[in-house]
Amino acid sequence: MTENRKDLTLVFEQVSDAELWALAEFVKRATWSEFRANAVDDDEAYRISDGVAKLQKALEEAGYSPR
């Protein structure tokens, strides 16, 4: 995979409040073992982890921050 960085803005127009809370809970609970089990190698697992962390931060900034 080439390292071409692209900015992406996601707009959740048809996602319910309950679905966003569930997504926030999921990304909070997801662990390295899930990332690694679904990746072809450690490098991809780290990229998955980084992407999930960014999604979690965006959800937190939007008010979806489960304890």
Task: Describe the residue ranges of each PLM region.
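Positively charged, low-complexity terminal tracts
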Residues: M1-R67
